[in-house]
Swiss-Prot record:
Gene Ontology MF terms: translation elongation factor activity
Major location (coarse): cytoplasm
Annotated protein name in UniProt: Elongation factor Ts
Superkingdom of the source species: Bacteria
Cell compartments where the protein resides: Cytoplasm
GO cellular component entries: cytoplasm
Phylogenetic lineage: Bacteria, Pseudomonadati, Chlorobiota, Chlorobiia, Chlorobiales
Species the sequence originates in: Chlorobium phaeovibrioides (strain DSM 265 / 1930) (Prosthecochloris vibrioformis (strain DSM 265))
Location of the region described as Involved in Mg(2+) ion dislocation from EF-Tu in the Swiss-Prot/TrEMBL record: 82-85
Function in brief: Associates with the EF-Tu.GDP complex and induces the exchange of GDP to GTP. It remains bound to the aminoacyl-tRNA.EF-Tu.GTP complex up to the GTP hydrolysis stage on the ribosome.
Gene3D superfamilies cross-referenced by the UniProt entry: 1.10.286.20, DNA helicase RuvA subunit, C-terminal domain, Elongation factor Ts, dimerisation domain
Length: 288
């Protein structure tokens, strides 16, 4: 067996990010051949990934990347097994690299990102293989759970990530005054993260959902002994309250409690003589 030098071990560690003892073992198993040692470690990572496939990866982080010109953005959730790994530089750096690759490559889905190729910093591997390599490096199951790419060629994207990176939101708006609307867009992204709306406006609430909620409220009212002639009014009142909870434009604005989001949009229109249209938003909370 050829002599394995400390420099070779260090070089392999610098290349792969794997621990010193594992690097030494890889070099010993491959007769000191650096390329074969790298491949050995990749295979080891793939084997560990297969072994840990059934493990529960419920920790991790929400990563958001937005283009400098605000014309595109991406939000993704990357999972691991423990909070300790989720907070580490290796994991967060990997999540950031995936987010940047998804942004630059306009990845339409998590599946599309898995087929893209990372930079040399991550071995020039496809994301699918790099996740296996990262599993071997960190000793935990790593999983790309979900991803949404937002194309805002007709407007701009803003985002908010809550401290701890377990909650985040991205929003796409359109306005004839995009520069003036950026601060409002950031506030709206924070609104989405904090208040968890499900649709932009009332018209987007599925009819079957309203029918379901109405039936629940009706049964509750009857169960409380309310008279039949008052039940419809009670149900309608509760449905209005439901709209205020789940419709973004009807929610109380988190920065000014006596104003709705729709009021804030109206104030912007008056001040800037330009409307702001909310095109779409995505909210991710870790583990949902």
């Amino acid at each position: 067996m050829s002599q394995i030098s400390a420099k070779d071990v260090k070089d392999l560690r610098d290349t792969t990010g794997v621990g010193m003892m594992d690097c030494k073992k890889a070099l010993e198993e491959t007769g000191g051949d650096m390329q074969k040692a790298v491949e050995y470690l990749r295979k080891k990572g793939a084997a560990l990934a297969a072994k840990r496939a059934e493990k529960d990866a419920s920790e991790g982080m929400i990563c958001i990347k937005v283009a400098e010109d605000r014309k595109a953005g991406v939000i993704l959730e990357l999972n691991c097994e423990t909070d300790f790994v989720a907070r580490g530089e290796v994991f967060t750096g990997f999540a950031g690299a995936l987010g940047q690759l998804a942004l630059e490559g306009s990845a339409a889905s998590a599946g599309a990102l898995l087929g893209m190729t990372l930079s040399a910093e991550f071995g020039g591997e496809k994301v699918e293989d790099a996740i296996k390599t990262m599993t071997g490096k960190l000793g935990e199951k790593i999983e790309l759970k979900r991803l949404v790419f937002c194309d805002a060629a007709d407007g701009l994207v803003e985002a908010y990530v809550h401290p701890g990176a377990q909650l985040g939101a991205i929003i796409h708006i359109a306005s004839a005054q995009p520069d003036s609307a950026r601060e409002l867009a950031r506030d709206l992204a924070m609104q989405v993260a904090a208040a968890a709306p499900i649709v932009v406006d009332r018209s987007a609430v599925p009819e079957e959902l309203i029918a379901k909620e109405s039936d629940i409220y009706r049964q509750q009212a009857l169960g409380q002994g309310k008279k039949e002639e008052f039940v419809d009014r009670i149900v309608q009142g509760r449905i209005e309250k439901y709209y205020q909870e789940v419709v973004l434009t009807e929610q109380a604005f988190i920065k000014v409690n006596n104003m709705k989001v729709s009021d804030v949009l109206g104030e912007f229109r008056k001040q800037h003589e330009a409307a702001v249209e909310i095109r779409e938003f995505v909210r991710y909370q870790l583990g949902e």
